[in-house]
């Protein structure tokens, strides 16, 4: 706080004064941290194994069945009765996470056909392949948030650079940039993704690269407007008169003020990225088949109307994430509003 400028401190206080946005930020960070530690919460491997008075940590390191008295040089199925008997013979025990299933682990002990309703074993039920719904929500939310954060960072980097160059130099640079933006923004992104998915199997990085080609367009106009206004201010003219380079003027004197409007847009870019990935997964053009995904879970709910817990769980998880981001974005917008 002491190193912040008076203006930055006022903005921080205004943001903290918005209780809805402030607590939404903390709740979103807590949920994100929860998903990052998903392997410690939902996993078919134990957190800790005590075997012959030695400790093993299968979550962090791969062990073979032979290390626990078995015969095969492969990773054991810790949930099987055979491995449990091996551990018991070694006077040991296993400590499993609260959810003893990973996102791709089927529950072979179901007494009814999948998808099965919520139970003491599967708290939110299973999907149509007997996989734990809560585990898939945790890992699916992590993929969505990481995808959105990466896409937002790339979009901000490209959008701020393009908008700064257009607004600062103006003239033919601005004119050419605007014409290119008009053409580029007119391309149908969804149809392009559908067409390309027929030639290349989509994955995380492939989708990120394609979406990054278009998601930066929304920031360009905001940054461009700030630079068009800022380049004519007196202190910018004075910096030029002193012989400072264009790079120094852009980075030190105009960009910090232009970031005020840009920061308030970032949460909404996050929501757009999460919604887009969910929609693509729902349509079957997103993450590879079998990947944990909120959109894929919603699609399963549509195909299995007799199992409402599938669609409702994914819907509420998605709605919670998007609502928190919208509240954070509104609080940031109010905090950076010069009229407040």
Feature locations, PLM:
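Alpha-helical transmembrane segments of integral membrane proteins
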Residues: 126-340
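Gly/Trp-centered helix-boundary motif
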Residues: 1-156, 160, 164-165, 300, ...
């Amino acid at each position: 706080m002491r190193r912040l400028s008076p203006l930055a401190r006022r903005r921080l206080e205004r943001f903290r004064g918005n209780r809805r946005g402030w607590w939404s930020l903390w709740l979103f960070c807590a949920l994100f941290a929860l998903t990052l530690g998903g392997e410690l919460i939902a996993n078919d491997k134990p957190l800790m194994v005590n075997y012959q008075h030695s400790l093993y940590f299968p979550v962090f390191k791969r062990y073979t069945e032979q290390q626990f008295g078995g015969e095969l040089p492969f990773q054991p199925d810790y949930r099987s009765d055979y491995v449990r008997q091996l551990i018991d013979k070694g006077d040991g025990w296993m400590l499993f996470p609260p959810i003893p299933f990973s996102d791709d682990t089927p529950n072979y002990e179901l007494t009814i056909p999948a998808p099965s309703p919520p139970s003491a074993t599967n708290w939110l039920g299973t999907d149509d392949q007997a996989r734990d719904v809560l585990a898939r929500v945790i890992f699916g939310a992590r993929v969505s948030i990481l995808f959105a954060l990466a896409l937002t960072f790339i979009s901000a980097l490209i959008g701020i650079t393009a908008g700064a160059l257009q607004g600062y130099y103006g003239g033919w640079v601005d004119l050419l940039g605007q014409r290119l933006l008009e053409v580029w923004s007119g391309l149908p992104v969804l149809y392009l993704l559908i067409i390309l998915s027929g030639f290349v199997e989509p994955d995380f990085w492939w989708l990120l690269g394609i979406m990054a080609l278009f998601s930066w367009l929304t920031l360009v106009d905001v940054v461009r407007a700030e630079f068009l206004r800022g380049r004519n201010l007196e202190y910018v003219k004075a910096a030029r008169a002193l012989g400072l380079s264009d790079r120094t003027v852009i980075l030190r004197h105009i960009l910090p003020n232009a970031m005020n409007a840009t920061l308030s847009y970032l949460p909404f870019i996050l929501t757009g990225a999460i919604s887009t990935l969910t929609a693509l997964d729902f349509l079957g053009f997103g993450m590879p088949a079998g990947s944990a995904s909120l959109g894929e879970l919603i699609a399963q709910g549509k195909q299995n109307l007799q199992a409402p817990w599938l669609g409702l769980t994914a819907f509420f998880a998605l709605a919670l994430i998007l609502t928190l981001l919208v509240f954070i974005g509104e609080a940031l917008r109010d905090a950076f509003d010069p009229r407040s």
